[in-house]
Amino acid sequence: MKVKPSVKTVCEKCKVIRRKGKVVIICSNAKHKQRQG
């Protein structure tokens, strides 16, 4: 899980979702997991 000030989708499988007010990117590729904060 990368924590970044700005999150962007890396590939077409990345999905942007909101969890508890935070922007989270989930993907089938575990390296693409990101969280804003």
Curated annotation (Swiss-Prot):
Q: Name one Pfam family in it.
A: Ribosomal_L36
Answer yes or no on keyword Ribonucleoprotein.
yes
GO terms under biological process: translation
Q: Which GO terms fall under molecular function for this chain's record?
A: structural constituent of ribosome
Q: Name the cystine pairs.
A: none
Look up the record and report any one GO term of the cellular component aspect: ribonucleoprotein complex
Does Ribosomal protein show up as a keyword for this record? Answer: yes
Q: Which UniProt keyword terms apply here?
A: Ribonucleoprotein, Ribosomal protein
Please name the SUPFAM superfamilies in this protein's record. Ribosomal protein L36 (SSF57840)
Stated family: Belongs to the bacterial ribosomal protein bL36 family.
Recorded hits in PANTHER family, A to Z, give: 50S RIBOSOMAL PROTEIN L36, CHLOROPLASTIC, LARGE RIBOSOMAL SUBUNIT PROTEIN BL36C
NCBIfam families, per the entry: rpmJ_bact
Q: What is this protein called?
A: Large ribosomal subunit protein bL36
At the highest ranks, the source species' classification is: Bacteria, Bacillati, Bacillota, Clostridia, Thermoanaerobacterales
* Gene designation: rpmJ
